[in-house]
């Protein structure tokens, strides 16, 4: 009987020890930064690898051209009235470089950690900066005291891990509080009510290089009939020797 009680007591002690160790691991995980918990490394220099919508991205489409964008009837007067010179004069030359469009603008990215819980994306096209903040709560939640809308808006991020071991994961980002801009350089609009959802994934290339795959979903109840989805790709570069920031322009 005493041996049985001793055995039971031993099992209980082992369970407490295991439970305590598990709780400690969970506590350590919850206190770790987003940088420490990253399942994939997105940092470095990346150049656009244009595999879709070449004719709409590499040159400015003609006025009135909005094929492949599910523009609503409300968008058509703006599309047909597009005047790049007027935009430039009004200081709106960055309208096609906002968060809903910037990843599709051909150019280079520089991705770094601004701090332990903020991933920073700089673009040489338009010299834009996106700050992806790993904040508590659901991505896309806008604070009650949100600042004025900006071209890059407010981006909340979180890591999404794959269930299988050693298979990495992806980054999910939701951006809101955007200043109204253009989905394409020729004046196809999106409104301040737009929300941009993105997934960032990595994929190997046959030559040993790495691709950054960005799936972008733009939702706008004002100027889009249905969500607009694009998938710009970027190839990793060895260094920043080709990094060449240029200002926004509405005329080229």
What is the predicted function of each stretch?
Residues 1-9:
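Bacterial N-terminal signal peptides that target proteins for export
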Residues 2, 20-252:
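PEST-like low-complexity, intrinsically disordered acidic/proline/serine-rich tracts
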Residues 8-17:
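Bacterial N-terminal signal peptides
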């Amino acid at each position: 009987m005493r041996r049985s009680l001793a055995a039971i007591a031993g099992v209980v002690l082992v369970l407490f020890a295991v439970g305590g160790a598990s709780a400690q691991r969970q506590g350590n995980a919850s206190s770790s930064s987003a940088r420490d918990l990253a399942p994939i490394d997105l940092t470095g220099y990346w150049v656009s690898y244009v595999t879709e919508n070449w004719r709409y991205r590499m040159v400015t489409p003609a006025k009135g051209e909005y094929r492949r964008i599910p523009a609503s009837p409300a968008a058509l007067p703006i599309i047909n009235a597009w005047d790049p010179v007027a935009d430039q004069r009004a200081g709106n030359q960055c309208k096609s470089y906002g968060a809903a469009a910037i990843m599709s603008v051909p150019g280079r990215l520089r991705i770094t950690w601004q701090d332990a819980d903020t991933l920073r994306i700089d673009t040489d096209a338009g010299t834009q900066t996106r700050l992806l903040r790993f904040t508590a709560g659901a991505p896309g939640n806008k604070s009650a005291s949100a600042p004025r809308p900006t071209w890059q808006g407010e981006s909340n991020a979180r890591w999404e891990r794959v269930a299988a071991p050693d298979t990495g994961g992806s980054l999910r980002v939701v951006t809101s509080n955007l200043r109204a801009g253009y989905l394409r350089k020729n004046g196809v609009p999106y409104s301040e009510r737009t929300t941009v959802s993105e997934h960032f994934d990595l994929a190997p290339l046959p030559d040993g290089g790495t691709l950054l795959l960005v799936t972008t979903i733009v939702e706008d109840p004002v100027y889009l009939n249905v969500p607009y989805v694009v998938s710009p790709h970027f190839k990793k570069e060895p260094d920043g020797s080709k990094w060449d920031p240029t200002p926004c322009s509405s005329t080229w």
